């Protein structure tokens, strides 16, 4: 069945037909297509555009078709051009003339825009809930390790001591922004395009607000041209997903480093690791590596959508068929990555001793030494210079700031006293950072509990 065959005298070339078809990937929207058709038929009957009895027949049969497809009793015909053609063809086979009335006052252009929006709205909710689940896992783990000292890094060099709980809460913040972006995107796509027709609306007296309400949309689109040609919602969701995947990729990179013998901060559970076919000792963080790699895939999906849309005149162009494979792939990728990543982090074994050992080296408490002098009345720049000289002294003598004799300290500045050793201890360095957003254990506990409350967890 072809919905556009009237003016043609030849059948479409078979290879071209295969090239033109989208049923292989848009069939996942069968529920959304039927939901949209039921709302459309209900509205047509209510407005007297088609007979109300026929409208009820159409709706009842569409529900049967959906039930049969989802139960496996009816297979989607992959020879159909797209999911819209399959559903309408199946309906017409069953109802005859009544089925042919369904497409009154509707184009595939506004139909597909509707289907994609309905599908993506649902997927926004799915991804939102998954990310929320991940945040809860991170918060619980942060509470467990709120006082475990580890090095904080800049330029991949040990910089200042923090806690592992603080580090985990940094990713919680990123993921909360991801949730916020998804919610914002859903708000902007909450406009029903049905009634826009091919591009110029319709002469039929439609009740667009009725179909929008039946389908759970907040409002209708305000311009028929924009209604059928807009794919901002696809690009925006793809951007949200790409950013979320970049966050997962950064976390993955750290997990990969932390699992190495050079760091040995964490150990992944066997259920989320693989081995080598030749090296018996290997335990590889393949899940984290795959997530890191797949982030590039979602960035590619975003680039596909942006590049596809950048040169299209209004209104609909066949190029826009390419939107679905890109956005579906992005959705599937993030969903799949989160499905494995969340339990990988939840079951990850933390090795506090190795974290603390790493934090004890590299003069990670030098800033606190400078702050000690500031507390004694010195300007920070002077304190900074003196501490730098002390670090150089330690390096030359093979000592640390903790083992450097007090006499040597006082050679550089008379303000140093025995209390400097307490001031530069790892516990003091971390516990003293009670500023909002700082790594002090009490801060980590407060922030984790605050976020859990926001997530609805008591």
Segments predicted by a language model, with ranges:
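Glycine-rich cofactor/substrate-binding loops
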Residues: 1-36, 97-98, 279-458
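Short runs of predominantly hydrophobic/aromatic residues within well-ordered alpha helices
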Residues: 37, 84, 88, 234-237, ...
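Charged, flexible cofactor/metal-binding loops and thiol motifs
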Residues: 116, 124, 128, 143, ...
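Positions in alpha-helical segments
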Residues: 39-42, 118, 122, 235-239, ...
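Conserved hydrophobic residue
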Residues: 49-50, 74, 264, 379, ...
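A helix-coil-helix interface module used to build multimeric assemblies
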Residues: 1-201, 206-213, 274-275, 286, ...
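Short alpha-helical scaffolding segments that buttress acidic/His motifs in well-ordered protein cores
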Residues: 41, 62, 138, 241, ...
């Amino acid at each position: 069945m072809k919905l556009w065959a009237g003016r043609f005298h030849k059948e479409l070339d078979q290879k071209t037909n295969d090239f033109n078809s989208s049923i292989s990937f848009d069939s996942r929207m069968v529920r959304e297509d039927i939901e949209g058709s039921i709302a459309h038929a209900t509205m047509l009957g209510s407005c007297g555009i088609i007979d109300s009895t026929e409208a009820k027949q159409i709706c009842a049969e569409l529900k049967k078709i959906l039930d049969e497809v989802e139960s496996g009793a009816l297979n989607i015909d992959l020879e159909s051009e797209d999911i819209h053609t399959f559903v309408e063809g199946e309906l017409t086979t069953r109802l005859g003339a009544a089925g042919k009335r369904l497409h009154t006052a509707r184009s595939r252009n506004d139909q597909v825009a509707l289907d994609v929006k309905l599908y993506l709205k649902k997927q926004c909710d799915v991804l939102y809930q998954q990310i929320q689940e991940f945040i809860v896992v991170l918060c619980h783990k942060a509470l467990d390790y709120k006082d475990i000292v580890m090095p904080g890094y800049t330029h991949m060099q040990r910089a200042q001591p923090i806690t592992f709980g603080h580090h985990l809460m940094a990713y919680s913040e990123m993921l909360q922004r991801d949730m916020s972006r998804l919610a914002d995107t859903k708000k902007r796509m909450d406009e029903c395009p049905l009634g826009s027709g091919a591009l110029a609306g319709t002469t039929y007296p439609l009740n667009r607000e009725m179909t929008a309400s039946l389908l759970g949309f907040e409002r209708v689109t305000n311009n028929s041209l924009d209604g059928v040609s807009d794919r901002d919602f696809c690009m925006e969701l793809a951007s949200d997903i790409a950013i979320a995947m970049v966050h997962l990729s950064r976390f993955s990179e750290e997990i990969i480093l932390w699992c190495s013998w050079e760091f040995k901060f964490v150990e992944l559970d066997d259920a989320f690791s693989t081995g080598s076919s030749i090296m018996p000792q290997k335990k590889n963080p393949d899940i984290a590596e795959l997530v890191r790699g797949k982030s590039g895939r979602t960035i590619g999906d975003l680039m596909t959508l942006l590049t596809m849309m950048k040169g299209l005149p209004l209104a609909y162009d066949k190029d826009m068929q390419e939107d679905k494979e890109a956005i579906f792939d992005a959705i599937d990728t993030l969903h799949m990555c989160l499905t494995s990543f969340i339990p990988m982090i939840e079951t990850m074994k933390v090795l506090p001793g190795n974290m603390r050992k790493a934090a004890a080296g590299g003069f990670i408490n030098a800033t606190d030494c400078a702050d000690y002098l500031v507390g004694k009345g010195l300007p920070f720049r002077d304190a900074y210079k003196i501490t730098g000289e002390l670090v150089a002294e330690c390096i030359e003598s093979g000592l640390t700031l903790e083992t450097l004799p007090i006499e040597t300290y006082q050679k550089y500045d008379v303000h140093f006293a025995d209390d400097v050793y307490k001031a530069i201890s790892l516990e003091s360095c971390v516990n003293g950072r009670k500023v909002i957003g700082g790594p002090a254990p009490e801060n980590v506990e407060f922030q984790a509990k605050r976020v859990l409350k926001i997530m609805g967890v008591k």
